[in-house]
Amino acid sequence: MTSDQNKAAVKKLVEGLGTNGSSSAFDVLHEDAVWTVMADANTFPVSGDMSRPAFIAHMRGFHESLPDGIHVSVTRVIADESNASVEATSNALLANGNTLNQVYHFAFELTGGKVVRAREYIDTARALSAFSR
């Protein structure tokens, strides 16, 4: 795939992590995709590798826990024929009444326009603070 096609694919996927995104966003994930949250499992409850089905189930559960959903905005995309990098922000009202304003970086590996590997970097301190206050 071309860099522009890969940019469009990962933008659709990342926007689809929000409840404001396309319902077909997860179609961008290859059936054997692995999604890794790059965080320390000893300090952050969502970390490590997830298969495509596990990641989709995790996101659906997360969406259901949010009273007003979550809005994800892509702020920058860089891509070539097999890799893409995405910066994004999100905001959501949590069930505990706190607001989560998060920043992300995603590194993707693509084959044939499908994401085969995703690495998600988030501000874990910001997330822990919002969920625990």
Where are each of the predicted segments found?
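Short beta-strand segments enriched in hydrophobic/aromatic residues
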Residues: 29, 90-92, 106, 122
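Short, low-complexity N-terminal intrinsically disordered segments enriched in polar/charged residues
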Residues: 1-28, 132-133
